[in-house]
A protein has these predicted regions:
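N-terminal cap/lid segment of alpha/beta-hydrolase-fold proteins
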Residues: 1-27
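Proline/glycine-enriched tight loop/beta-turn segments at coil->beta junctions
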Residues: 27-34
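Active-site glycine-rich loops that stabilize anionic/oxyanionic intermediates
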Residues: 32, 40-43
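The conserved beta1-alpha1 loop
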Residues: 36-40, 66, 113
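Conserved alpha/beta-hydrolase
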Residues: 45-47, 52-78
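Alpha/beta-hydrolase active-site loop
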Residues: 82-101
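Alpha/beta-hydrolase fold nucleophile elbow
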Residues: 103-114
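Alpha/beta-hydrolase-fold enzymes
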Residues: 115-163
């Protein structure tokens, strides 16, 4: 049985350099947990709405972050406009994360696809107390056979033993 949605709207977010964007939301009437989702590189947040709707039907409030230069972002990459990971990790993601506060103190997961998953890992590492879970889809990890010995042989063990 799917849950009725209480909110299918958007939250406006922005940072001091003038960049603003829309955080798309799908919030069920009685959410049990929430997810801040980071898209793959070059993919607008709106393409994840079917995922957000499916998760919301299962009781999860979903918030879709928008990358600089994509979708609702007021910026576009050009020779006159440049940004890097510092902008994403220290400005944009904290602003999107802060917009979730109005939905209460639900257990929060962060996740993403591809580059979004890698940046989600970095953001979670910078704010370890903020997230209960990390969701990754096709986010790439270092393949153990690419490393020289002895690290090559220690990595599979580390992958199995780390939480």
């Amino acid at each position: 049985m799917s849950m009725p949605l209480a909110s299918d709207d958007a939250l406006q977010a922005g940072v001091g350099d003038g960049h603003s964007w829309t955080v798309l939301t799908r919030v069920p009437a009685a959410p049990r947990q929430s997810l801040l989702w980071l898209p793959a590189l070059g993919v607008a947040a709106r393409h994840y709405l079917p995922l957000a709707e499916a998760l919301a039907a299962q009781g999860m409030a979903v918030f879709l972050h928008e990358w600089r230069g994509n979708g609702s972002s007021t910026l576009r990459a050009s020779r006159m406009q440049d940004w890097g990971y510092r902008h994403l990790l220290c400005e944009d993601l904290p602003a999107s994360h802060a917009r979730l506060a109005q939905h209460g103190a639900l257990p929060l997961a962060i996740g993403g696809q591809s580059l979004g998953g890698q940046v989600a890992c970095c953001h979670a590492a910078l704010h370890p107390q903020a997230f209960a879970r990390l969701w990754l889809v096709a986010s790439g990890t270092a393949y153990w056979r690419c490393f020289a010995a002895p690290r090559r042989y220690l990595l599979p063990l580390a992958y199995r033993l780390l939480p």
